[in-house]
Amino acid sequence: MPASNFDAIQLAGNGTNDTPLNGFRVYTQSLDVASVAAATSAEQTFTVTGLATTDRVVVSKPSLTAGLGVVNARVSAANTLALTFMNASAGAIDPAAEIYTITAFRT
């Protein structure tokens, strides 16, 4: 779904290895995660229009799915969110589609 424009903020750091934060954007989008096999992790990709490869992302799954965790989030290509899911259970997990919150930080 469309998001608002990047909100401009500037943060002061200690100067040496700082990367200025130029803004952030919050997306809410329905993601339909494919089944994740037992005792494994798997990366899946989703289209999120507006993401750039230089963005850093934080993703919030809206509900608890026993045995399933989101263990990594990255922008793998322009407009593409890559999420790694870990299944710690003894059986496959196929979660229902949900509205995830994706916060992108632009540097």
Question: How would you describe each model-predicted region?
Answer:
Residues 2-51, 81, 91-107:
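Extracellular receptor-binding modules and their adjoining Ser/Thr/Gly/Asp/Asn-rich linkers
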Residues 64-67, 91:
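Extended, low-complexity, turn-rich repeat/linker tracts enriched in Gly/Pro/Ser/Thr and Asp/Glu
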Residues 70-75:
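Glycan-recognition/cleft segments
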Residues 77-79:
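Residue-level recognition of beta-strand termini and adjacent short loop/turns
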Residues 85-89:
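Asparagine-centered strand-capping/turn motif at beta-strand->loop junctions
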